[in-house]
Regions:
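A short, flexible loop at the N-terminus of ABC-type nucleotide-binding domains that lies
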Residues: 1-10, 14-27
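The feature captures the beta-strand-to-loop junction immediately N-terminal to the Walker
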Residues: 41-43
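Helix-to-loop junction immediately C-terminal to a conserved catalytic motif
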Residues: 56
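Conserved ABC ATPase "signature" region
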Residues: 96, 100, 107-125
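Conserved ABC ATPase signature
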Residues: 129-136
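Catalytic Walker B motif of ABC-type/P-loop ATPase nucleotide-binding domains
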Residues: 154-158
Length: 245
Protein backbone atom coordinates (compact mmCIF):
# COMPACT_ATOMS: atom_id res chain seq x y z
CA UNK A 1 0.00 0.00 0.00
CA UNK A 2 1.35 3.45 -0.93
CA UNK A 3 1.79 5.45 2.28
CA UNK A 4 1.13 8.66 0.34
CA UNK A 5 -2.47 7.55 -0.25
CA UNK A 6 -3.17 6.55 3.35
CA UNK A 7 -5.63 8.85 5.08
CA UNK A 8 -5.54 7.22 8.51
CA UNK A 9 -3.66 4.33 10.10
CA UNK A 10 -4.75 2.63 13.34
CA UNK A 11 -2.24 0.21 14.82
CA UNK A 12 -2.76 -2.35 17.59
CA UNK A 13 -5.50 -0.39 19.34
CA UNK A 14 -6.45 -1.62 22.79
CA UNK A 15 -9.23 -0.12 24.88
CA UNK A 16 -10.74 -1.40 28.12
CA UNK A 17 -13.62 0.27 29.91
CA UNK A 18 -13.18 0.89 33.64
CA UNK A 19 -14.48 -1.97 35.75
CA UNK A 20 -14.57 -4.45 32.87
CA UNK A 21 -12.61 -7.71 32.95
CA UNK A 22 -11.98 -7.88 29.21
CA UNK A 23 -10.94 -5.18 26.75
CA UNK A 24 -13.54 -3.82 24.35
CA UNK A 25 -10.83 -3.73 21.67
CA UNK A 26 -7.77 -5.94 21.54
CA UNK A 27 -5.06 -5.18 18.97
CA UNK A 28 -7.18 -3.74 16.16
CA UNK A 29 -5.43 -2.51 13.01
CA UNK A 30 -6.80 -0.55 10.07
CA UNK A 31 -5.24 1.29 7.14
CA UNK A 32 -7.62 3.54 5.24
CA UNK A 33 -6.61 4.71 1.79
CA UNK A 34 -7.89 7.79 0.03
CA UNK A 35 -11.10 7.01 -1.83
CA UNK A 36 -11.50 3.62 -0.14
CA UNK A 37 -14.68 2.33 1.51
CA UNK A 38 -14.26 -0.15 4.36
CA UNK A 39 -17.23 -1.99 5.85
CA UNK A 40 -17.04 -2.22 9.65
CA UNK A 41 -18.90 -5.37 10.63
CA UNK A 42 -19.58 -7.35 13.76
CA UNK A 43 -22.36 -8.54 16.07
CA UNK A 44 -23.78 -6.22 18.71
CA UNK A 45 -21.13 -5.63 21.36
CA UNK A 46 -18.27 -6.51 19.03
CA UNK A 47 -16.42 -3.22 19.54
CA UNK A 48 -17.51 -1.26 16.46
CA UNK A 49 -18.77 1.79 18.36
CA UNK A 50 -15.71 1.80 20.61
CA UNK A 51 -13.45 1.68 17.56
CA UNK A 52 -15.27 4.63 15.97
CA UNK A 53 -15.01 6.62 19.21
CA UNK A 54 -11.23 6.10 19.22
CA UNK A 55 -10.91 7.26 15.61
CA UNK A 56 -12.92 10.37 16.50
CA UNK A 57 -10.72 11.11 19.51
CA UNK A 58 -13.63 10.75 21.93
CA UNK A 59 -11.66 8.09 23.82
CA UNK A 60 -7.94 7.41 24.12
CA UNK A 61 -6.60 3.87 23.64
CA UNK A 62 -4.60 2.35 26.48
CA UNK A 63 -2.10 1.14 23.90
CA UNK A 64 -1.58 1.38 20.17
CA UNK A 65 -1.86 4.59 18.22
CA UNK A 66 -3.66 6.38 15.42
CA UNK A 67 -1.66 8.38 12.92
CA UNK A 68 -1.96 10.12 9.59
CA UNK A 69 0.62 10.29 6.84
CA UNK A 70 -0.12 13.67 5.26
CA UNK A 71 1.15 17.13 6.07
CA UNK A 72 -1.92 17.83 8.20
CA UNK A 73 -4.54 15.70 9.96
CA UNK A 74 -7.46 14.55 7.80
CA UNK A 75 -10.82 16.20 8.23
CA UNK A 76 -13.05 13.54 9.82
CA UNK A 77 -16.84 13.78 9.82
CA UNK A 78 -19.21 11.46 11.65
CA UNK A 79 -22.75 10.45 10.76
CA UNK A 80 -24.04 8.82 13.96
CA UNK A 81 -26.86 6.31 14.16
CA UNK A 82 -28.80 8.79 16.29
CA UNK A 83 -30.19 11.91 14.69
CA UNK A 84 -27.61 14.71 14.96
CA UNK A 85 -29.78 17.77 14.41
CA UNK A 86 -32.20 20.02 16.27
CA UNK A 87 -35.73 18.76 15.56
CA UNK A 88 -37.45 22.11 16.17
CA UNK A 89 -35.27 23.84 13.56
CA UNK A 90 -35.85 23.61 9.84
CA UNK A 91 -33.37 21.73 7.67
CA UNK A 92 -31.99 25.08 6.45
CA UNK A 93 -31.66 26.41 10.01
CA UNK A 94 -29.83 23.25 11.08
CA UNK A 95 -27.36 23.60 8.23
CA UNK A 96 -26.89 27.31 8.97
CA UNK A 97 -26.20 26.49 12.61
CA UNK A 98 -23.67 23.74 11.97
CA UNK A 99 -21.93 25.70 9.21
CA UNK A 100 -21.61 28.56 11.69
CA UNK A 101 -19.57 26.28 13.97
CA UNK A 102 -16.91 25.98 11.28
CA UNK A 103 -14.26 28.65 10.73
CA UNK A 104 -15.56 29.83 7.36
CA UNK A 105 -16.28 33.08 5.61
CA UNK A 106 -19.95 33.86 5.07
CA UNK A 107 -19.54 33.21 1.36
CA UNK A 108 -17.86 29.83 1.88
CA UNK A 109 -20.46 28.80 4.48
CA UNK A 110 -23.27 29.66 2.05
CA UNK A 111 -21.55 27.76 -0.74
CA UNK A 112 -21.12 24.62 1.38
CA UNK A 113 -24.72 24.76 2.57
CA UNK A 114 -25.97 25.03 -1.00
CA UNK A 115 -23.79 22.11 -2.08
CA UNK A 116 -25.00 19.98 0.86
CA UNK A 117 -28.66 20.76 0.15
CA UNK A 118 -28.35 19.81 -3.51
CA UNK A 119 -26.13 16.81 -2.84
CA UNK A 120 -28.63 15.33 -0.39
CA UNK A 121 -31.74 16.45 -2.32
CA UNK A 122 -33.12 18.62 0.48
CA UNK A 123 -34.36 21.53 -1.65
CA UNK A 124 -38.08 20.96 -1.11
CA UNK A 125 -37.58 20.29 2.62
CA UNK A 126 -35.20 23.12 3.48
CA UNK A 127 -37.90 25.19 5.23
CA UNK A 128 -39.61 22.27 6.96
CA UNK A 129 -38.93 21.57 10.61
CA UNK A 130 -36.72 18.51 10.90
CA UNK A 131 -39.09 16.77 13.29
CA UNK A 132 -41.82 16.75 10.62
CA UNK A 133 -39.60 15.25 7.93
CA UNK A 134 -39.72 11.57 7.05
CA UNK A 135 -37.08 9.19 8.36
CA UNK A 136 -35.39 9.16 4.97
CA UNK A 137 -35.16 12.96 4.81
CA UNK A 138 -33.85 13.06 8.38
CA UNK A 139 -31.10 10.61 7.42
CA UNK A 140 -30.25 12.80 4.44
CA UNK A 141 -30.07 15.82 6.75
CA UNK A 142 -27.68 13.89 9.02
CA UNK A 143 -25.43 13.27 6.02
CA UNK A 144 -25.72 16.85 4.75
CA UNK A 145 -24.55 18.22 8.11
CA UNK A 146 -21.48 15.97 7.99
CA UNK A 147 -20.70 17.01 4.41
CA UNK A 148 -20.45 20.66 5.46
CA UNK A 149 -16.97 19.79 6.73
CA UNK A 150 -15.83 18.56 3.30
CA UNK A 151 -14.35 15.50 5.03
CA UNK A 152 -11.37 13.48 3.93
CA UNK A 153 -12.78 10.60 6.00
CA UNK A 154 -16.46 9.97 6.62
CA UNK A 155 -17.49 7.65 9.45
CA UNK A 156 -21.03 6.32 9.05
CA UNK A 157 -22.75 4.38 11.83
CA UNK A 158 -25.88 2.56 10.64
CA UNK A 159 -26.84 5.43 8.30
CA UNK A 160 -29.85 3.67 6.74
CA UNK A 161 -31.64 2.37 9.83
CA UNK A 162 -35.39 2.85 9.66
CA UNK A 163 -35.65 4.15 6.10
CA UNK A 164 -37.63 2.93 3.11
CA UNK A 165 -35.93 1.16 0.18
CA UNK A 166 -35.94 4.29 -1.99
CA UNK A 167 -34.23 6.39 0.68
CA UNK A 168 -31.76 3.60 1.36
CA UNK A 169 -30.85 3.39 -2.32
CA UNK A 170 -30.36 7.16 -2.45
CA UNK A 171 -28.05 7.18 0.58
CA UNK A 172 -25.99 4.29 -0.78
CA UNK A 173 -25.65 6.00 -4.16
CA UNK A 174 -24.55 9.20 -2.45
CA UNK A 175 -21.89 7.38 -0.40
CA UNK A 176 -20.70 5.62 -3.55
CA UNK A 177 -20.38 9.02 -5.27
CA UNK A 178 -18.33 10.37 -2.37
CA UNK A 179 -15.94 7.43 -2.53
CA UNK A 180 -15.56 7.79 -6.29
CA UNK A 181 -14.49 11.42 -5.83
CA UNK A 182 -11.81 10.59 -3.25
CA UNK A 183 -13.54 10.58 0.13
CA UNK A 184 -12.57 7.68 2.39
CA UNK A 185 -15.43 5.93 4.17
CA UNK A 186 -15.71 3.66 7.19
CA UNK A 187 -19.20 2.18 7.00
CA UNK A 188 -20.57 0.44 10.10
CA UNK A 189 -23.73 -1.57 9.50
CA UNK A 190 -25.52 -4.88 9.99
CA UNK A 191 -26.76 -4.86 6.40
CA UNK A 192 -24.39 -7.08 4.44
CA UNK A 193 -25.84 -6.15 1.06
CA UNK A 194 -24.97 -2.50 1.67
CA UNK A 195 -21.33 -3.36 2.37
CA UNK A 196 -21.21 -5.59 -0.71
CA UNK A 197 -22.48 -2.70 -2.83
CA UNK A 198 -20.20 0.13 -1.74
CA UNK A 199 -17.18 -1.31 0.10
CA UNK A 200 -14.04 -2.82 -1.40
CA UNK A 201 -12.64 -3.88 1.99
CA UNK A 202 -14.03 -5.03 5.33
CA UNK A 203 -13.01 -5.12 8.98
CA UNK A 204 -14.91 -7.80 10.92
CA UNK A 205 -14.80 -7.59 14.72
CA UNK A 206 -16.14 -9.79 17.49
CA UNK A 207 -15.44 -9.42 21.21
CA UNK A 208 -12.98 -6.69 20.33
CA UNK A 209 -10.83 -8.90 18.13
CA UNK A 210 -10.29 -8.83 14.37
CA UNK A 211 -11.80 -11.94 12.77
CA UNK A 212 -11.26 -10.89 9.16
CA UNK A 213 -9.75 -7.88 7.48
CA UNK A 214 -8.79 -6.94 3.94
CA UNK A 215 -9.96 -6.95 0.36
CA UNK A 216 -13.54 -8.21 0.18
CA UNK A 217 -13.13 -10.14 -3.06
CA UNK A 218 -10.07 -11.96 -1.73
CA UNK A 219 -11.82 -12.83 1.52
CA UNK A 220 -14.85 -14.16 -0.33
CA UNK A 221 -12.63 -16.32 -2.52
CA UNK A 222 -11.65 -18.28 0.58
CA UNK A 223 -7.88 -17.83 0.04
CA UNK A 224 -7.37 -21.39 -1.15
CA UNK A 225 -10.28 -22.84 0.79
CA UNK A 226 -13.90 -23.21 -0.29
CA UNK A 227 -15.11 -19.77 -1.44
CA UNK A 228 -17.94 -18.10 0.41
CA UNK A 229 -21.23 -17.64 -1.40
CA UNK A 230 -21.64 -14.08 -0.14
CA UNK A 231 -20.62 -11.70 2.64
CA UNK A 232 -23.28 -13.05 4.99
CA UNK A 233 -21.85 -16.58 4.78
CA UNK A 234 -18.35 -15.22 5.44
CA UNK A 235 -19.70 -13.29 8.44
CA UNK A 236 -21.46 -16.34 9.87
CA UNK A 237 -18.42 -18.55 9.32
CA UNK A 238 -16.10 -16.30 11.30
CA UNK A 239 -18.48 -15.32 14.09
CA UNK A 240 -19.65 -18.90 14.69
CA UNK A 241 -16.04 -20.08 14.77
CA UNK A 242 -15.35 -17.39 17.37
CA UNK A 243 -18.16 -18.82 19.50
CA UNK A 244 -16.71 -22.33 19.18
CA UNK A 245 -13.24 -21.11 20.12
Amino acid sequence: MNAATEVLVAEQLVYQYPGQDEPALCGVDLKLQRGQAVGLLGPNGSGKSTFISLLLGLRTPQSGHIRHTGDKPPVIAWVPQEYAFYPELTCQENLDLFAGMLVLSNAEASRRIEVAIHSCMLQEFSHRRARYCSGGVQRRLNLAIALLQQPDLLLLDEPTVGVDPQSRAFLLDRVHDLVSTGTSVLYATHYMEEVSKICSHILLLDHGKVLASGDLKSLLSGSGFTPFENLESLFMHHTQRQLRD
